[in-house]
């Protein structure tokens, strides 16, 4: 009887260690998604000195580029709140992140102001979906007692994006071109 309990205890510990490793991987992936989403949102403001002369646009037109992402992200996040609960969260996150990558790549490849504006709207539509899904996944996966720690870990991506992501993106813009970040 004692051997059986020891075996059961060993298997429980092994499963617990496996789950902790998986938790860390999940948190890293979710934080990376938040990081890229926030860098993409924030990078436009400091790129104004590159974009306005490149596209020969006014400061008002540049403000459209900055706000296009914000408004489309807000609209998609609000609208998605009514629909996405019926779908698998992982699939919605993957769908949103795929669209976000396409929109972000389109931003870097945009040859004109209007195409960049459309690409910013597209990236924002999917970016808004990402932010909501990340928090929903944390709420689903982590027990109540661990949720605050998990959300804090993922939300630290905001601080990292602003302190390291944006300066690195500006470094790439200086080194290569505004298309790089």
What is the role of each PLM region?
Residues 58-66:
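Juxtamembrane helix-start elements in MFS-like secondary transporters
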Residues 119-157:
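Cytoplasmic helix-loop-helix junction between adjacent transmembrane helices
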Residues 42, 70-78, 162-163:
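Residue-level signature of mid-helix packing/kink "hotspots" within the transmembrane helices
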Residues 153-181:
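Helix-loop-helix hairpin linking two adjacent transmembrane segments in secondary transporters
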Residues 38, 42, 124-132, 163:
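Small-residue-rich segments within alpha-helical transmembrane domains of MFS-like 12-TM solute carriers
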Residues 75-114:
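Conserved MFS/SLC helix-loop-helix module at the cytosolic interface between two early adjacent transmembrane helices
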Residues 25-59:
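Extracytoplasmic
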């Amino acid at each position: 009887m004692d051997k059986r309990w020891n075996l059961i205890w060993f298997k429980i510990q092994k499963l617990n260690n496996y789950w902790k490793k998986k938790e860390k991987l999940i948190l890293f992936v979710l934080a990376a998604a938040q990081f890229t989403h926030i860098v993409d949102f924030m990078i436009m403001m400091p790129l104004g000195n590159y974009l306005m002369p490149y596209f020969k646009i006014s400061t008002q037109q540049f403000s459209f580029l900055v706000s296009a992402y914000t408004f489309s992200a807000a609209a998609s996040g609000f609208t998605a709140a009514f629909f996405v609960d019926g779908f698998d969260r992982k699939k919605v996150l993957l769908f949103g992140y795929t669209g976000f990558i396409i929109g972000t790549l389109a931003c870097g490849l945009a040859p004109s102001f209007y195409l960049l504006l459309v690409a910013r709207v597209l990236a924002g539509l999917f970016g808004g979906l990402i932010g909501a899904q990340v928090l929903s996944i944390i709420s689903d996966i982590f027990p109540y007692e661990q949720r605050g720690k998990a959300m804090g870990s993922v939300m630290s991506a905001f601080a990292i994006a602003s302190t390291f992501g944006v300066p690195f993106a500006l470094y790439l813009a200086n080194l290569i071109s505004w298309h790089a970040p």
